[in-house]
Structures are given as structure tokens and as C-alpha cells.
Amino acid sequence: MALKALILNTTLRRSPSRSQTQGLIDKAVPLYEKEGIETEVVRVIDHDIEQEYWDDYDDWNAGEKARREDEWPWLLEKIREADILVIATPITLNMCTSAAHVILEKLNLMDELNGDTKQFPLYNKVAGLLMCGNEDGAHHVAGTVLNNLGRLGYSVPPNAAAYWLGPAGTGPGYIEGKGDRHFHTNKLIRFMVANTSHLARMLQETPYTTDLEACAQAAREESDDVFAIRVNVNTPAIRYKRFQKLGEVKVEESQLG
């Protein structure tokens, strides 16, 4: 089965405005094609992705207001279908963009386990990162974004982040600054594409067999103070129940939010 890569351009510039980040993406796409990987690029800001979330995304209108339809279910389906997810983000204020952060927040709600594998839905998928900016911030953004994607189930290979940084102060962007001729950036893009492609092939052949339910149960039995995740396919928000091990007496129940 052919592997698929989805690259999310999280620039804050809508089409048809020029995106410096798209310049980095344009270097990565043909490299994925050489690897035999089908690649799709989505500019997130061009689509209606609500920042708000609901306990039950499919049926939230039990309250006073009806949920306004947005395009998150459409984008989520593309993320589910992709073997490789690459977040491509400008660096703003030493961070990823708000559009990238919304994607991470939305994915953080995907806590349901696959009934067959007993794993999170993003297991056996690979994550990569492209960053574009000036001055500093690339290592900080890589650390936070890739760590969060790994916590959500993605596998992160070595050298999974590539970036271009301009000179200190205001200066030309990736396109005007001829970032496509910059050795270190070109090297890192090739590292990222090669390693995400390699790991995706490995996981297609030999996926993880970790049973998260069994691991949680074993941990529960050896622990005195247990936070057990209540998993519900139709209610993506994570709920925690805290139990006192002695007698399994329920002492607290809360919902993140």
C-alpha cells in the first residue's frame, strides 16, 4: 500500500498571499515523491477551523446554542489517513503560529483507543516539522511541537525537524533570502524526508503491538494513587477518575477544560 504524507502549512497568510513557509514545503514535496510517497499540502488558514471544542463534537447542540459547522472533521480525516504528518510553521514570538497550536489542541482531544489494537489513533504514524523564521526559536519550537506529537502517539525519527532562520533583525524571508540555496537548511530537509519516510515504511511492515489498556491496568494494580483515563469514542475530551486503591473508593472526578 502506498504511503501518504500530509503537510500542514500553518502560515497566518491566506492564499494567494506569498508564504515563506511554502518555500520550505516546495523543497520537501519532490523529495517525498522520490521516496514514492504521495504528498498533499493543506494551508490551514484557508479553511474554517474553529478554535472552540466540544465534549461531543458530533452532537454538541444539547446546550443552549447549536454548534456551527466547520472544516475540522474534514481535516481530521486527512490526518487520520496520512502515514506521515508534517507541521510546517513560521516562527513567531519564539513559538509556532496560533494555527499550528490549534491543530495540536484539536489532536489532543483524540484520546479514544482503537478497539482492536488498544492504541491511540495516531499510533504507527510518523511526525516531522518544517520551520521558517528569523533569529532564534527553531530548537524551542521543535522541542515543543515534536514532543507533543510524540505524546499523542506519533513516532518521531532522528533529525525530524528542518528549519531556515534569517539574520538577526528584520530581513529577507526564506524566498527573498534564497533559503533554497542554504546548505544547512537543504541538508536538514533531506534528513527529515528520508527519516520520516524510512520510519513510516518500518511501521507499515511492523506496527507497534503495545496494548495501552493492558499497560494501564498493570500500572493501576501496582499503584496506590491511580489516575485512570476514561476512554469514550464519542466523547473526545479526556476525563480522569481518581481512585484510592484501598477499597477502590472514588474520591474525585474532573474534566480537563
Curated annotation (Swiss-Prot):
Biological role stated in the UniProt entry: Involved in the biosynthesis of the riboflavin analog antibiotic roseoflavin (3,8-dimethylamino-riboflavin).
UniProt cross-references to Pfam families, sorted A to Z: FMN_red
Pathway listed: Antibiotic biosynthesis
Full protein name: 8-demethyl-8-aminoriboflavin-5'-phosphate synthase
Site feature Important to position the amino-group donor glutamate, where: R13
Biological process, per Gene Ontology: antibiotic biosynthetic process; antibiotic metabolic process
Outcome reported for the amino acid change (mutating N94A): Loss of synthase activity due to the absence of substrate binding
Keyword set includes Flavoprotein: yes
Lineage of producing organism: Bacteria, Bacillati, Actinomycetota, Actinomycetes, Kitasatosporales
Binding site for FMN: 11-13, 19-21, 91-94, 132-136, 240
UniProt enzyme class: transferase
UniProt source species: Streptomyces davaonensis (strain DSM 101723 / JCM 4913 / KCC S-0913 / 768)
Record EC number: 2.6.1.114
UniProtKB keywords: Antibiotic biosynthesis, Flavoprotein, FMN, Transferase
Subunit structure, interactors included: Homotetramer.
Family under the similarity heading: Belongs to the SsuE family.
InterPro entries in alphabetical order: Flavoprotein-like_sf, FMN_Rdtase-like_dom
Disruption phenotype: Cells lacking this gene are unable to produce 8-demethyl-8-aminoriboflavin (AF).
